[in-house]
């Protein structure tokens, strides 16, 4: 059984989708990042970087419990555990892992900054807004070009790389992106989001999504001194 510590964010949804696709049993433990639950000592034992998702597998290697953080590592682990969504063919495997790292090192961080400066920052900084809007569009362009030559992002089959990227592409309006400018990407994204397991994964903790802007207290926890306090 997987105990999953998560919240309804793109990084959480990656792992939700993978668990739904594989059918591995899991329990959800909400970690309300707006309330500061990611700084709780028990959570930090699992995720020392105070980020979610994180998980504990009670039936890890050798039948012993294992805890994990970083969503990309979790996807690789779950692929290994299930034998699914990471090809055995070495060329396909390493291509898939390359595109997974593209998400971890590029898509997630850069689109996250676009979300912040275009939507959350307390002041509008034109340089930052333009910087991350342009970077978002550059990344969408990279994906668009890739999908013109490959049915899926990692190789010719659906893999953890697709699961990692697609949740970040659900909110192009928050990133300064006109999605219709990337028709191949849009078609691929929508095809994946129509998968039953992807639908279920994106609905995990959907009732906890914030309907409006963050409160001042939440902003302090997420973006202010609470986030950067030494622990």
Regions found by a protein language model. Name each.
Residues 1-130, 230-231:
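GST-like domain detector, emphasizing the conserved glutathione-binding G-site
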Residues 78, 100-196, 231:
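GST-like fold's C-terminal all-alpha helical module
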Residues 36, 189, 209-210:
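Generic structural signal for helix capping and beta-alpha/helix-loop junctions
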Residues 32, 160, 205-208:
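Short, solvent-exposed turn/loop segments enriched in Gly/Ser/Thr/Pro and often Arg
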Residues 205-231:
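Acidic/histidine-enriched, glycine/proline-rich intrinsically disordered or flexible terminal extensions
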